[in-house]
Amino acid sequence: MKRIAYPALAFALLALPAWGAAGPFDPAKSPVPPSDGTSTTPGKKPMPELPSPYTKNYTRGAVPPANGQPVDLAYGAYQRGQYVTAFREATKRIEANPKDAAAMTLLGELYNQGLGVKQDPVKAAEWYRLAAAQNDAAAMSSLGLMALDGRGVPKDAKAGRRWLEQATAHGSPTAAYNLGLILIGTGNAADEAAAAAQFRKAADAEIGPAQHDLGVLYLQGRGVPKDPSKAAELFRRGADNGDLASEVEYAILLFNGIGVTKDERSAARYFLHSASRGNAIAQNRIARLYAVGRGVAKNPVEAAAWNLAAAGQGLSDAWLDQTLSGLSADERTRAERLANERIEQR
């Protein structure tokens, strides 16, 4: 693992990009510039229909029985990472009931990811298609993503969109979110409104990235009336659902009192949490707060440690470098140690 070392040379006095801020700013007076939401939305990718095992919502073992149905042993094994068992149980279910759409979808997922079986996107698409014929929304959603990527099926954007529309109509909030990503990418004002409607469906299902993206639209007034208060509420919910981008945006609004009551200490706590989870923007912002003593007690060593962590991810800050240039050799060593310990803990 590459270790971080504090630079010993003179610091170049270059301006840090605003990262979503409008116009110039003085970090000493305003260490957290307002955001228009674009600083946390680079390279958005579609969400898979089935979450990977061991995520926060999928660590409880077998799915509890519903409506008198037996425990779902196949999905339970999948959620625990027992993929061979999941494959065997799903296969047994299909042998007993050739129209078991959920088992077909699970086999498709196992083949798609190469879990418990040799990865085979073509077979995955075949199983998804069989499940989709039984009106399984998750299978439709996965087929849509495969068509968009040309994975296991011919690449076809129109077909991908149709599958996502069908999945959304059958109640998949993940498909609604992915459909919203397609719509927002066209650049048409009408599609922005349609994208907002799809994001709202997913946001209502507590999908964090959808809450973030809908919040950005409210912050910018795209597809919906501009409303920083609604943006703040969506970012807060997204943060509660574990979405780092939402957490950072909510912290920015909290710090500046935009759409929510100004609270620098709470903002600092959100930044610190996101920084600890590896978000470079949060690492930079909490470093600034430690440097000037806003929301947290002034602590140059902590500021330097977080500045190093952000710089290690490509987000340098000439203002921070200059502000912290008077650190002693011992303070620099402590900052390096803290930064490297945090990297190793993630």
Annotate each PLM feature.
Residues 8-17:
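Bacterial N-terminal signal peptides
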Residues 20-91, 95-96, 102-105:
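N-terminal leader/linker segments that initiate helical-solenoid repeat arrays
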Residues 48-61, 67, 297-298, 311-346:
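Terminal, low-structured helical/coil segments at or just beyond the last alpha-helical repeat
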Residues 63-66, 70, 77-78, 82, ...:
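Short helix-capping/linker turns of helical repeat alpha-solenoids
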Residues 70-77, 89-93, 104-113, 144-149, ...:
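Hydrophobic face of amphipathic alpha-helices that form TPR/SEL1-like repeat modules
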Residues 81-88, 118-127, 154-163, 186-198, ...:
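Structural signature of tandem alpha-helical TPR/SEL1-like repeats
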Residues 92-95, 129-133, 165-169, 200-204, ...:
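Conserved structural position within tetratricopeptide repeats
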Residues 103, 139, 175, 210, ...:
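TPR alpha-solenoid repeat register
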